[in-house]
């Protein structure tokens, strides 16, 4: 049964940026932003009028310091790397989408014998890699930043061969009480928030096998 912040809130006519459903409900509001929830896929998203522009968004990303030699960072990324490695064939091809200024997950997978390509809107904007298909794709701490998750989701599906894997890492919405205290929403570049039900909706719609690993890793497999 779908649970929203309040069954008595007025429906707001903001199209969901993921499934395009025209009906959303007020979910939460703080001093900086209003958050809405789609009545169909349950995506929680920031009011589009309150998102950063591209210049401010990149300035925030430039503050990130991800060192490929940082053992702690590698341990963090191993939460998605290890289950992907368990499921793919030797010498597979993959793409790390949204790899950031210090690609690390791709290096970890290359070290295990796989052939990796990189793409990032700001730091590795080589769009030629988006014209190929791969055995697997990874996107760690990426999906929550997407202004157009509908378009990028379809792009991800197109990047992966039949039977291929998509490995994602993102924190997921639990309920509005937890959301109110959630530090994850406070990052100004975090604009869409998925729940398990959102991923279940997408998996059913797009005929994907879905697995949750722990609290923040999502694996999806395309049909053969």
Where are the model-predicted features located?
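Short conserved AdoMet
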Residues: 89, 147, 161
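Residue-level detector of anion-binding/catalytic polar loops
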Residues: 115, 165, 209
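A short, conserved alpha-helix within the catalytic core of class I
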Residues: 146-156, 170
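Conserved beta-strand signature within the Rossmann-like core of class I S-adenosyl-L-methionine
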Residues: 163-171
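Conserved N-terminal segment of class I S-adenosyl-L-methionine
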Residues: 1-136, 140, 153, 169, ...
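Alpha-helical subdomain
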Residues: 177-181, 185-196
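Feature marks short, surface-exposed loop/turn motifs that line or immediately flank catalytic pockets
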Residues: 125, 174-176
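A short His-aromatic
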Residues: 141, 145
């Amino acid at each position: 049964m779908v649970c929203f912040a309040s069954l008595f809130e007025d429906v707001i006519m903001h199209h969901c940026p993921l499934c395009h459903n025209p009906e959303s409900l007020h979910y939460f509001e703080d001093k900086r932003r209003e958050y809405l929830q789609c009545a169909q896929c349950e995506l929680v998203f920031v009011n589009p009028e309150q998102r950063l522009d591209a210049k401010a968004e990149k300035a925030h990303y430039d503050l990130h310091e991800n060192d490929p030699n940082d053992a702690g960072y590698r341990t963090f990324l191993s939460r998605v790397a290890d289950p992907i490695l368990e499921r793919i064939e030797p010498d597979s091809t993959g793409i790390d989408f949204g790899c950031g200024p210090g690609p690390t997950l791709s290096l970890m997978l290359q070290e295990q014998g796989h052939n990796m390509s990189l793409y990032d809107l700001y730091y590795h904007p080589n769009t030629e890699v988006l014209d190929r298909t791969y055995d697997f794709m990874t996107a760690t701490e990426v999906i929550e930043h997407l202004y157009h998750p509908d378009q990028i989701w379809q792009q991800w599906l197109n990047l992966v061969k039949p039977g291929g894997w998509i490995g994602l890492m993102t924190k997921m919405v639990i309920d509005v009480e937890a959301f109110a205290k959630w530090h994850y929403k406070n990052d100004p570049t975090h604009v869409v928030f998925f729940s398990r039900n959102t991923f279940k909706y997408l998996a059913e719609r797009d005929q994907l096998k879905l697995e949750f690993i722990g609290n923040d890793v999502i694996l999806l497999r395309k049909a053969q």
